[in-house]
Amino acid sequence: MKLYRSLDRYKQRSVDTLMESMIENDMLAFREQCVAAFTRLGHDELPVSAGTGMPLTDTFDREYVFLRNSRSVCRADTIITVTGDSMLPTFRDGDELLVEYTPEIEVGEIGIFVVAGEGFVKEYQPDGLHSHNPKYKTIRPVQDDNFRCVGRVLDVITEDMLATPRELAVLNEIYSSKRDN
């Protein structure tokens, strides 16, 4: 600071300009890092039950979440929230799941299913859809149930996957400027 004060005002202005440029470059680099490090995923307000079932409707709200890139985040198509306790201890009520849309999953995988118009998160087995909580029975869909697989559960969202407030502010600014153009 002492050296800065010893400069005449023109040299101080030059130092100020250089510092502003350096700060701007740091911010641009941080923005680029955020864009490269995060994926924007839609969070479907589509209830899926880890319990006795949740009626599905054709309309639902969609909000977006920025998640740190990982194999499961990059494969995911959406985020869906668990309702109920039938998948304890694997999933808890309120857990947010990364889901990849697919009409089929392998035996032993956990998926999102529609049975008779209700959404479920269950483990797929040849004899039906299994809960991990032993107090729930296996769901054995019949042809009249209009049974279908919506997607494969890839992972549960954890705190460390989420953007920090600073990262989120930058990502929201970037996204809003893209949307406005």
Predicted ranges, named:
Residues M1-E45:
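Charged, helix-prone or intrinsically disordered regulatory segments positioned adjacent to compact structured domains
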Residues A29-Q33, A37-F38, L46-A50, P55-Y64, ...:
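Acidic/glycine-rich C-terminal interaction modules and beta/coil loop segments
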